[in-house]
Amino acid sequence: MTDVSEVIGVWRLRAYYLEIVQTGERIEPYGAQPKGVFMIHPDGRVVVVMTPAEQRKSVTETDQAEAFQKLVAYSGLYRVELPDRFVTAVDIAWFEPWVGSEQARRFTVKGDTLEIVSEPTRTPLTGDALVIGVLSWIREGTMRG
């Protein structure tokens, strides 16, 4: 990739899985059809929100806690380190340990598809396990079916 403008825009989540580094096991924490939006603004801010495809309506405190546990939401200022590294300086997040951190990802853009691969990290979704997240996004307005 040589043109940073290729990543600018609004992207919809098409697929998401976590791979446990130690075992190679793959987990789809949000199921086969996760929901998410990844907004990359030309002014240097990114906003990410992801949820499972199927959620119960939050009726009880337990339901609400479960929904929150499966949420991913953060924002911050980003920079692109060519050829393929995207770094977000997180300034607000659902998961307090991410605030003040830099979240680095590798990326590739092929047409209207953006693939993001995280560096090994820990997430509330998998406890203490070190995982690599793999996300496939499609540019909003081009998603079919």
Task: Label each residue range with its predicted role.
Residues M1-A73, L77-G145:
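Lipid interaction determinants
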